[in-house]
């Protein structure tokens, strides 16, 4: 059976991920008038730029929906966000500043929870606003079919008739007005924004040009810390984890992870923490550029990784980072619930996160400028007396012990010298001018 429908399935139940904006409003009304029975589903993801969630389903009913549901996805979204922090599932970074995969996390939750709600209502055809050039069309496709194997996909933006009749925002606005729904287009921004409780993504339009930087963005989760007239005072904050779970901020415990995340967003947002400018590779391998906000994710990630480095050994930390890079890419590709991702994620949560108990104190300043002021944990393996430059009682090892350890290194040093001689004879290395250190030759082959 074909899973992607190229034209509107008239007379059938069709679900649409409904945001209440012009695009989905026009699509809903158009599908209704063309003969589909339209069901509208709205995800409450805690979007910081959404004022009234309850109004969105009411709009959908006015535009002709058979049924409109608001699905609260916030708790599940925060659960997945914490899992990403625990497993370090972030593969895109620039200069050590990470993109926290907040949009991929939102799509994983939206794609599964909305399709599950549709299935309850007997709706097995799903449409959303993702375009064919982006990542979301594939993410939603995967998560939708994982949740409901009987699902078929209909996207108005892939239907040539819809494109011919309502090809742009001006046509959509005129269409709504002509049918009694005065819809005044909002002023066009220089970029588009997509957000959820974990973070915000700003991209497209002017931001497609690399000479347009972060300064054209109006933050929705933080402050424009780059502006001289933006007052940002230094602030000390403590973050506490218990067995990998963030449980307290500044001594205040939170039973509800959503409430904790909202407070983390507020604290980090006051400084513009977690904003970054990234060039990334989309699923189809074309590069795109985005400017991201994630104040709460950044705050929790910094504290979590500080405890990771103070508690775990080098090999565990190395594996955590390597696996996190791989897991981050799987998450980005819409494979967060695939077996290979679950394997990496569960391993990190079991063998890394469960040991992460403690408290980290930070001083936040402007943007990503911060200092770590204190680190406390009953599980720390950091012990300054082991390497103290002062004379200590019961030293863990002696000068004689180190002499023996260094002597054992003679074996691999000799092996390395032998290999260098082999490479020199093969013409891959030559003696450095005025130096006994070999240097690489240009590849002649």
From Swiss-Prot:
Chief place where the protein resides: cytoplasm
Keywords of this entry: Amino-acid biosynthesis, Arginine biosynthesis, ATP-binding, Cytoplasm, Ligase, Nucleotide-binding
Pathway: Amino-acid biosynthesis; L-arginine biosynthesis; L-arginine from L-ornithine and carbamoyl phosphate: step 2/3
Reaction(s) the record says it catalyses: L-citrulline + L-aspartate + ATP = 2-(N(omega)-L-arginino)succinate + AMP + diphosphate + H(+)
UniProt key word Cytoplasm: yes
GO cellular component, one term: cytoplasm
Binding site for ATP: 17-25, 43, 129, 131, 136, 194
Residues that bind L-aspartate: 131, 135-136
Cysteine disulfide partners in this protein: none
One Gene Ontology MF term: ATP binding
Keyword Ligase listed: yes
GO biological process, one term: L-arginine biosynthetic process
Cellular localization per UniProt: Cytoplasm
PROSITE patterns: ARGININOSUCCIN_SYN_1, ARGININOSUCCIN_SYN_2
UniProt-listed InterPro entries: Arg_succ_synth_type2_subfam, Arginosuc_syn_C, Arginosuc_syn_N, Arginosuc_synth, Arginosuc_synth_CS, Arginosuc_synth_type_1_subfam, AS_cat/multimer_dom_body, AS_multimer_C_tail
Binding residues for L-citrulline: 99, 135, 139, 192, 201, 203, 280
Annotated signal peptide: none
Pfam families assigned to the protein according to its UniProt record, in alphabetical order: Arginosuc_syn_C, Arginosuc_synth
Parts of the chain that traverse the membrane: none
Entry EC no(s): 6.3.4.5
Subunit note: Homotetramer.
Family, similarity comment: Belongs to the argininosuccinate synthase family. Type 2 subfamily.
Protein name: Argininosuccinate synthase
Source organism of this protein record: Rhodopseudomonas palustris (strain BisB5)
Lineage: Bacteria, Pseudomonadati, Pseudomonadota, Alphaproteobacteria, Hyphomicrobiales
